[in-house]
Amino acid sequence: MKKKLLSLLMGLLLVAALLPAAVQTAWASDYDYIHSYQVDVTPNTNDGSLSILVSFQWQALEDLPATNSQKGGVKIGIPNGSIRELTALSGDIADIQNDNSYVYIDFTHDFRAGEVFSFSYSWVQEYMYTLDGSTVRYEYTPGWFDGIRVGSMTLTWHDPAGVTGTASDGDTYGGDHVLTATDMSHGEKLPLAVTYDNWPTALDSQYSKDNLPGGYDNSYYDDDSS
C-alpha cells in the first residue's frame, strides 16, 4: 500500500513539475498579435520583378523595444535577398534593412504591452518568375509567422495593364486576384501562383527564379518577429 501511495505521489509531483513549463512555453510564443496583414503585389512587364507593398496592424502583447535585437523591432520573411527600393512608408519606422531571409524593422520608439500600432513598407523583389515557352508563372508566399497569430490576412495580386493572369486560388475581380484568410494559426501560410499566357515582353531566363545567384539564395525562411 505504501509503495502504491509513493508511486502516486511521485506521479503527481512529476505532473506538477512539467505543467508550468508547458504552460510557459505555449504562452511565451505569443508575444505579439497581428490584427491585419495586407500584401499587394504587381508584376513589372519589362523585367518580371514584383512590386510588393506590405501593411500591418500589429499588437505588442509584451513590451516591444524599438530596435531589432533579440526581442526588439520586428522581422518579416522575404523570398530571397535580391531586392531593391526597400522603402519605409510609415513614420514610426526608424530604419529598415534586409538580408537573404528577412526585412528587419527598427521603430522610432518602444511599444508598451497591449499597444496597437500600424506600419507599412514596400520593395521590388527580383528572381521570382519561371518560364515555360511563352508562359510566365509566379509562385509567391508572403512571410509567415511561427510565433504569432494573424487575425486577418489579404493577399491581392494585381495584373499589369493589358495582361490577364490565371490564379491558383482565391477570387478574381477584374485584374485583381484576391486571397484571404482569418484566424491564422502559428506558421500558417497564404501561397499563391499566377500564370500568364499572354505576357507582352520577352523576359530573360537569366533573371528567372531558376537562376537565382547563390549569394541571394534562401531555400527556407522561418518568419517571426524578434
Predicted segments with their positions:
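Positively charged n-region of N-terminal signal peptides that target proteins for export
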Residues: 1-5
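Lumenal/extracellular ectodomains and adaptor appendage modules
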Residues: 23-226
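Bacterial N-terminal signal peptides
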Residues: 9-21
